[in-house]
Each structure stands twice: as structure tokens, then as C-alpha cells.
Amino acid sequence: MSDLLDDPTPGQNAPEFSVSEISGEVKRTLEGTFGRIRVRGEVGRVFKARSGHLYYDIKDDRSVLACTTWKGQISGLSVVPEEGLEVVVTGRLTAFGGQSKYNMNVDEVAVAGQGALMALLEKRKAQLAAEGLFAPERKKPLPYLPGIIGVITSPSGAVIRDILHRLRDRFPRKVLVWPVAVQGSNSAPEVARAIDGFNALTPGGALPRPDLIIVARGGGSIEDLWGFNEEIVARATAASDIPLISAVGHETDTTLIDYVSDLRAPTPTAAAEHAVPVRLELLGWVENQGARMANAASRAVQLRRQRLGDMARALPRPDTLLETPRQRLDRVSDRLPNALISGVQRRKLTLSDRAASLRPATLRGLVSSRQDKLKNLSSRLTLRPITQDLGRKRDALDRITKRLNTAQSSRIDRQIDRLSATARQLDILSYKATLRRGYAVVRDGAALVTSTEGARKAAELSIEFADGTFDVASAPSTTKKSAPKPAAPKAPKTPGEQGSLF
């Protein structure tokens, strides 16, 4: 007994674990003890990874619980966690042995109370109102009779059937349905993409762009309708160039899209009624207007006919109008033969008077005087001044021609002298002049050879002298001989004949 009490190493009978073993035991104990649980708290940090998984914290005034919702479970959430929102999450606790941490895998999120959702809604509402998204001047007028109506809703619910039935009763129109999820975490992004998608269509394209958009959903709780309170939906609605009618929930339900849309309808059926008029009412109105126009035209014709009759009765009779002109014509007709005879007689007397004053002798004298005058003028016209002037002009032309020939010859001589001087200078500066003094140019093909090393490496050499070029074969040499010192060139007799070696 004393040996047991005096054991210097107590606790040796306690089990021993490795770090991995104890982490696994903690994980199994944690998951087996708690199972599926519900935790209430305020959403803290929210982070969505590139993989699609959602990471966030649930906290109270003393502790923080890390939560994870996997990518495949996000679409099943009725409410997407947002920072500051009080929620109740449902899932299972688990532990990560690698870091000795535990967290909660959440597959269901519910708002802890409608008060929290309403507070978040009021916060978003105030923010969007401050940006001017609810301003009345931003509202676009609805087309009176749209040719194509785009409907964004669930394709399988009663909402689309009610809208199509109401449109068919009032005024059948072409309808394009963009199917979306109207509940859950995917609802808001799908509705926003549908609004943007309708606006991106080309008018008159294969899939024509609608003239009016209806966003519709049936009634439900605030959690069910929460997708239409998301900021992404409100901003897509505000950015739409196509007029938009919102018909979400019942008449007592109001969402953010209702404030931003161009018209809020209490129900989807009411949205269809706002979209198109009643065809029968239009036909009745057209018939009524046609009848009114026909009556007005008939009254106008009767009035014009009555005025025409009154004016016709006020006009004088045609016989009365023509009586005076007829009398005047008769009087003129009676005087016309006598007037013609008198005019002819007066013309004959005038012609006789003029013919009596014309005598042949007078005419001959006038012609003779004109001929004498012409002869006098001809005698005074001589060619001597013209001939003298032409002679002077010819002498001047000869002098100018001689001067021009002399100047041209002088200019040509100067150009020839200048060209000869340039040719002599070119010959002096050319390497050909150097070759004539005993030098040579060695080439390997087109390349110059300037050293013995280059000559040994060359396959074939060509040497250019002043009087021609010949080819030589390059032979390898094992001994290097010094090149003979070139003789100093003789001084030229005249400075003008010295060349230049480049």
C-alpha cells in the first residue's frame, strides 16, 4: 500500500494520444454529442469564396461561432446571411483537426424575427431613396398598346396562367416569358439577370425586345418575398430602359422593387390589366368615333349644300349677264367693214405720197457720191508704214537671237568645265587612283580581306589591280611571315595629282 501511495510518477495509467488521435476523438465526440442543432445569433463577417462556398460568423455579445454553407446548399437557403442580420441557423457542429478549431456546417438559415428583416429593409429603402431611385421624375410612361410583353416569373405557377388569361381576355399580345426562381437565394440574381437580359435584346431581332416588362410573383411571407427586396433587383429595375410593372405578392405586400418600378400593380392580374386596354372597349370607342365623324361630315355636307344653293340663287341669270356684251358686239360688227375700207384707203394714199418722192436720178447721184468717198479713203491707205515697222521688228528679233545663242553657248561651256573638274576630283578621290600607284584590293567573294588571318581562312581570293582582277587559291600556312614593308610612295610632281586612300 505504501508503495502505491509513494509512487513517484502518478498518472501513468492515463491513456496517451497523439495530436491527430485526440483531434479525431474530439471531432467524433463533438459530432456524436450534439448532432443537428439550431443556433441563434447576429451575422458578422460574410465571405463567399471563389469556389462558391459561403463562410460567415454567428455571434452574440460574448462569443463567435464560425459557420460554413457549402456551394450546393446555398440555393436551398430561404435567406442569404447578411452582416447585421439576426438569424437562426440549423446544421451540425464539426471540428477541423488540422487547426484544432470547430465550426458549424449550416444548411438552413431563418430570420430570428420579422423585426430584423424589417429593420434591414428600412435601411436599404433609406439608402436607395437617398440615391434618388424612387423619384417620380424617373418613372417612365407605359406604352398604350405594347406589341411584345416580357414576363419575369416562375413558369410553373398560377401567376403566369393568370397573366396570360387576362391578356387574352383584354387584348391578346405576344408574350415572352423569362423563367426565374421567385423564392430562395437564387431568386434575386436570376430576376436581375432577366431584367438586364430583356434590355439587352435588339429591337426587331430574331428574339425581339419587349416593349413592356412585368415582374410578377404570388403572395407569401416576408421571407418568401425577400428576393425582391434585394439591392441587386432594385438597381436592375432602376437601370431598365424598358418600362416595368411590378406585381409581387398581394396588395398589402410591398417590396423594394415596387418603389423603383415604373408602376406597382397590387396583383399579377392587375398588372396585365394595366399593360393593355380592353380590345372590345377600343372597338366600341372606334365605332363611336366613326359614327361621330360620319354625322359631322353629313352635317358639314348639308351646310355646304345649303350655302351653295343660297349663293346660286343670288347670282344673276346668264341671259342677263350676256345681254350687254351681245349688244356691244353687234355694234362693233356693224362698224368693222367700213373701218377696214377706210384703213386700206389711207394706206394707199400714204404709199402714193412716198413713191412720188423717190426719183431714179437722185438715187444714182447718191450712189456715185458714196463711191467717190470710198476711192478717196482707199488712196490714202499705203503699205509703206507697215513694211517699215516689220523691218524694225525683224532686226530686233535677229539681235535677240544672236544674244540668246551667245549666252547659251557660254553657259554650256561653263557647265562642261565644271563637269570636267568634278570628274577629275572624282578620279582623284577614287580608290582606282590608289590602285594605279601600285596598291591592290584583296577580296573573299564580296567581302574585303584586311589581314593574313582572313586570307588563310578564305576559300578563294580575288586580287584587284589597277588594270584588272585575277583569282588565287588560298593555301594554309603554318609559319607566319612578316609582310615586307611597303615602299614609301613617291611625292607627286604637282599637288593636284595626289590621291587619297580610304
Swiss-Prot record:
Subunit structure: Heterooligomer composed of large and small subunits.
Keywords (A to Z) from UniProt: Cytoplasm, Exonuclease, Hydrolase, Nuclease
Disulfide bonds: none
Family in the record: Belongs to the XseA family.
Record's GO cellular component terms: cytoplasm; exodeoxyribonuclease VII complex
Cytoplasm is among the record's keywords: yes
Main location: cytoplasm
Domain of life: Bacteria
Name recorded for this polypeptide: Exodeoxyribonuclease 7 large subunit
